[in-house]
Amino acid sequence: RFRAIGPEEPRAVAGGGGFSGNIRRTAMRSDIMKKGLERTPHRGLMRATGLADEDFKKPYIGVCNSYTNIVPGHCHLKKVGEIICDAIREAGGVPYEFNTIAVCDGIAMGHSGMKYSLASREIIADSVETMGSAHPFDAMICIPNCDKVVPGMLMGAMRLNIPTIFASGGPMRAGKTEGVSHNTDLNSIFEGVAARVVDKIDDAQLHELECTACPGPGSCSGMFTANSMNCLCEALGIALPGNGTIAADSPERVEYWRRAARRIVELAKMENPPRAKDFVTAKSFRNALVLDMAMGGSSNTVLHTLAVANEAGLKVDIKDLDEISKATPNICRLAPSRGEFHIVEECNRVGGIMAILKEIAKKPGMIDGSAPTVSGKTLAEQYAAAPDADGTVIRTLDNPYSEKGGLAILFGNLAENGCVVKAAGVDPKMLVHKGPAVIFESQEEACEGILGGKVREGDVVVIRYEGPKGGPGMQEMLAPTSYIMGRGLGSSVALVTDGRFSGATHGACIGHVSPEAAAGGLIGLVEPGDMIEIDIPNRTVRLDVPEAVIAERRKSWKPREPKIKTGYLAKYASLATSADTGGVLKVN
């Protein structure tokens, strides 16, 4: 159902998949800034950076890094950039490294900093576009690793549309905590806070969690947003196999970075090199969404895939995602989830993303294996080389975790344009639920209320005015959802919000409610005690209040004054759309 918007440029594609290509004989994109008499001053500036005569004949590779030492997913990327730049030089290219910002959602969680997280995605996209346009690189390798950085770089890459490979920093290993029988991660610490409040654990146990759950560099362990998006890059064909699952601190990862660097130089040297949009097409986009449902990715992937599709010129409706979910068996369940689940390291050990795709492709109509990839092979050629599903970490089609995908899109009067729930992480007892609304006007208010005992069994927590426009910035709700879990209410309390959730969230947590409260959505008219009905199997969420009463409430509703009136967030709020369109910025 996906289609391109506008005319497609004709592209010569060598072979069945791939862009094997010939050595370039025509002008390079970088010649715009380095060739000819008029570019003598430009060459003078580049010589000041260390270039010699022979370097002006080589392809220029933009190395888009997101290094910062405050973010564990990015603290090692300075070294990664060095490894990749060295490999580019060895392969005959000239690397030019530049940086984007990177916000750690975990560190920004639960305070005003979280308002900047989603908004940072747009800054990252703009930065990639700006650097790659002001300095016309022949190709680009992107080194993202955290939640908004992956989609932000993807959006920027779509705008530039030059040969591009994504080579992420890799996932963090799972934590091993004394006294805890299962693997731990960031989510374990958040839940530990609530458990400490009600004396389920003591100070020493909480400190042990704090010190061991996040053992080293990498994107947070688990199928959270960053790891989900890095995995989807493999299915999109814009990353080599292993991008989403090879551990950040492993020797295998170092070789992965070198291999990606060598390959981007090969692409740049081709006579007719494939560009980013040659990989991110309607067919590869559908492949990525099927993978998302098969592995039960983060609910935030819905938000980001819609935004990337918009930049790629693809028309994708949120309803399309639910149709794919209904048809896609969930065959791999990685933390965080309910019941039996595994960790990213285990998934990598049994074949990673290619093994998941190999199994899901056995169901007719699921995967289009003819999609090209940056490796030069088709997607089918790539996953054909993967091991068969092991039956435990990656289940077979005849024994899935569920017949439907891990994410579900719900509709109803409370979310006329849709909302999202990670169905794979919902307690079976909460798949259908009806309860009274307990309303909070912000995440901060909700955290205080939940920890203060204002939420009881059976309630439906409503957190509103936290959408892209109303927040502004659409804060993640990991803290309140973790507090619900930590207080032992995960199997009896639901949460509904126009904000979003961390990929670490699990439980009956329904987010991305559209239209949001700030845009006049019905969620802004809910009153304390109103009954809310949730039916995930039938994809509905509704406010059980007579239409006449709703109409009267709507008459008295007025838009609220913006929470922030200066700076970037004020600009962001004025341009942001609701979640059903990816929360992208629209300029009238």
Regions found by a protein language model. Give the residues of each.
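Short, Lys/Arg-enriched N-terminal segments with co-localized hydrophobic residues
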Residues: R1, P10, G16-A27
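Short intrinsically disordered, low-complexity coil segments enriched in acidic
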Residues: R1-P7, K34
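Intrinsically disordered, low-complexity serine/threonine-rich segments
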Residues: I5, N22-I23, A167
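Generic low-complexity segments that are intrinsically disordered, proline-rich and/or Lys/Arg-biased
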Residues: I5-R11, E547
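Catalytic or ion-coupling anion/metal-binding cores of large enzyme and transporter domains
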Residues: R25-G73, V80-I101, G106-I107, S112-S117, ...
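Glycine-rich, highly charged phosphate/nucleotide-binding loops
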Residues: S117-D126
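A short, small-residue-rich loop immediately preceding and capping a beta-strand
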Residues: G132-M153, I165-S168
